[in-house]
Swiss-Prot record:
Native species: Homo sapiens
Phenotype upon changing R218G: In LCA5; uncertain significance
Name of the protein described by the UniProt record: Lebercilin
Lineage: Eukaryota, Metazoa, Chordata, Craniata, Vertebrata
Cellular compartments annotated: Cytoplasm, Cytoskeleton; Cytoplasm, Cytoskeleton, Cilium axoneme; Cytoplasm, Cytoskeleton, Cilium basal body; Cytoplasm, Cytoskeleton, Microtubule organizing center, Centrosome
Biased composition (Polar residues): 527-547
Name of the gene this protein is made from: LCA5
Coiled-coil stretches: 103-297, 389-485
Amino acid sequence: MGERAGSPGTDQERKAGKHHYSYLSDFETPQSSGRSSLVSSSPASVRRKNPKRQTSDGQVHHQAPRKPSPKGLPNRKGVRVGFRSQSLNREPLRKDTDLVTKRILSARLLKINELQNEVSELQVKLAELLKENKSLKRLQYRQEKALNKFEDAENEISQLIFRHNNEITALKERLRKSQEKERATEKRVKDTESELFRTKFSLQKLKEISEARHLPERDDLAKKLVSAELKLDDTERRIKELSKNLELSTNSFQRQLLAERKRAYEAHDENKVLQKEVQRLYHKLKEKERELDIKNIYSNRLPKSSPNKEKELALRKNAACQSDFADLCTKGVQTMEDFKPEEYPLTPETIMCYENKWEEPGHLTLDLQSQKQDRHGEAGILNPIMEREEKFVTDEELHVVKQEVEKLEDEWEREELDKKQKEKASLLEREEKPEWETGRYQLGMYPIQNMDKLQGEEEERLKREMLLAKLNEIDRELQDSRNLKYPVLPLLPDFESKLHSPERSPKTYRFSESSERLFNGHHLQDISFSTPKGEGQNSGNVRSPASPNEFAFGSYVPSFAKTSERSNPFSQKSSFLDFQRNSMEKLSKDGVDLITRKEKKANLMEQLFGASGSSTISSKSSDPNSVASSKGDIDPLNFLPGNKGSRDQEHDEDEGFFLSEGRSFNPNRHRLKHADDKPAVKAADSVEDEIEEVALR
């Protein structure tokens, strides 16, 4: 369309150019006629060539005055004005105008008019073409819009195809599922139809059988039905009779149960009263035993009245021996139940383990006269020790008898409980048999369950009471052990005359382990009691740890919280006491004068403990005022000697010190001091273990 619009425009421009050139040539050369003829001939030729155009131009010329264009009007006026001006200017010059000029002028005017008409026509055409161009542009814009829409639709075709494919797949799946459902329903319909056919067939058979009344099976069935009804009536009668009997028996059984419960409560109350009486008697016996133990343990202590250093040292050793025996008596009573002789046997190797040490030639040259004196002096010590041992044996016998009585009481209680349980079980079995037969087991279970609940409550209450009683006994034993650990030392008898009697027999001797302990208290442990705390700790650190055999015969018998497989305490105690007697006999034969001499004592300490033991003895002998400095940590039986005048004063002061029991006196402080050296040997630990065992049970 653009090319078509462009081609007529170019033709019109060419025509306008041709007319313009001819018009200018006419105005430029008005005088030349030749040119005018040429100009006149040119439009004529144009008219000849384009006759159609002339007709159209004529039409336009005729139409032009009707609708003159705005552009054409000023051109016409201008041409006319210019023509008039030229004519006015030329009129005086050319007065003699010819006809040729008039013709030329008229031809020019005609030409101008024609050109003006053509211009107006062209302007009209141009306006029409502009309108046409605008309309074509609008059409092009619309067509472009339509094309864009079409292109967009073409682009969307792929998406539409994809969506369409998805819809097709979904529809196919739905179709498949619906087909499967249809098949399943068809199968069900077939099954139901087959079942219906079978049921119809069976129904027809049953109808035929029911219509046939003259069958032999029907008579048999009627007879069986009558017999079953008769049996049912008989069973109902029996059930009624049994239910009545059951009610009567349950009533009688409840009465018996109430009577037995009353008896059980009465027996339980009596048992409580008897248990209280037994406990009261047991506490009384314990208190009496404690009083006897306290009197027997501290009735035969030695007083410290010694005029010489040697006698004072011998008295110290004997007092240490007595304190060891007192500890053994008190602590042996506490832990007799848990003691096992298999763990710590008394072998002759332990007794004679230190004999080879005393066979050296330096210790064999002893003073025989001092041996005689010491032997006769220590003979008097054995009498109170023997009495104490006999009392200890009697106390142990009483303790064992009490244990046997308690065991018998426990066995009786258990037997009574077992009998009651057996009786209840037998009664329950008797009741359950008719209940299971009649099918009314639940009616009789209610009182039985109540009885079981009461029985369980009674058992729980008995267990609680037993546990509380056991805990109370353990607390009392703890209090007793504490009271026995810290007793008050009474005055000891005067053994000076016995120790230093003139009748002494000369005899060589050997030290054993037990005699060494009885002299010095566990390898001379009590030597540290006359020194301050630091020196005692140093000597304790130098000493090697005690072997298990030492626990069998010393100041303490340990308990290891094992009550099973106990041996006979009487045979064990008798063997132990025989050993102590033998050791004391050896002690009476030994010479006390060896230990009283400072040089020989220092040698013995060096052999046993090295240089630390001798340094402690030298510090004791050099420091006479150490008793006053370390009064709280010193054994009251061991004091340092001075000159004779001061010794008598110290003896009087010590007698007053023994009499004042509550004045900064603690006889068991040295035991607590050395408790860290032997942590396994503690009675309190065993009692705590027993408390934990009872709580766990």
